[in-house]
Amino acid sequence: SSAASDVYKRQSYHTPDGEVPALNHVSLTLRPGTVTALVGPSGSGKSTLATMLARFRDPDFGTVRIGGVDLRELPSTDLYRLVSFVLQDPYLQRQSIRDVITLARPDATEQQVRDAARTARILDDIDALPAGFDTVLGEDTNLSGGQKQRLSIARAVLADAPILVLDEATAATDPDCEAEIQQALAALARGRTVLVIGHHAESVIGADVICVMENGSIAACGTAEQLAEQPYWVRLSAGRIMEGVTR
């Protein structure tokens, strides 16, 4: 529902080790069905802000809300049905591949699990393992970075959550199938409320809203056209910045 996919962040800020604020009184509303991209230099707070939506961390002050409900009041099972995430360095616990994919849908059928793996271009890799979907990560096998990415995409596909948190650098972790992963991500994002952690101008230029972050605050928000005079966006668009590092 539109209410479930209306994400609202208000005065959220987080201080690692109680020192410099990683986020400083940030307010941001994600409208249902739109794509919002966060861009900014390394350390600007974009990943901290985005991962709060998946409750990897909670704000010291302020709230993160979905449909008016504070995330801290939501059971994790409900949160996983509302928010799925595909991040640059997916943290996968020591559990079976099946358990990883079915995080939000533990009652999924075998066919649904296989279909999700197929959509994420990881099914053949799983079937090639002696234990298949029962393979325990970190014990029976160690997956490549690209395979872990595709596993997290399969999890998001199966979850079918209305909100998606996505790091657009995901595809770059596996050059051999970068185009396939991009296609899977594009299909996954369609029709959802999406929050993108952006690193390259061309990958976020079509976003409904682009927010430029600096020093834990939002410096400017708008379309690519509206940000034409914003210094960081100008440098990013000109290709002078890669992965948040000026070259």
Model regions and ranges:
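Short, small-residue-biased leader/transition segments that mark boundaries at the very start
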Residues: 1-8, 94
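A short, flexible loop at the N-terminus of ABC-type nucleotide-binding domains that lies
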Residues: 2, 12-25, 75
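Conserved beta-strand
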Residues: 9, 21-31, 36, 62, ...
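ABC ATPase NBD Q-loop/coupling interface
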Residues: 14, 63-78, 179
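ABC-fold ATPase nucleotide-binding domain signature/coupling loops
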Residues: 18-21, 59, 65-67, 123-151, ...
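The feature captures the beta-strand-to-loop junction immediately N-terminal to the Walker
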Residues: 39-41
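ABC-family ATPase nucleotide-binding domain "signature/switch" substructure
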Residues: 44, 48, 54, 81-89, ...
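ABC nucleotide-binding domain "signature motif"
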Residues: 60-70, 209-210, 218
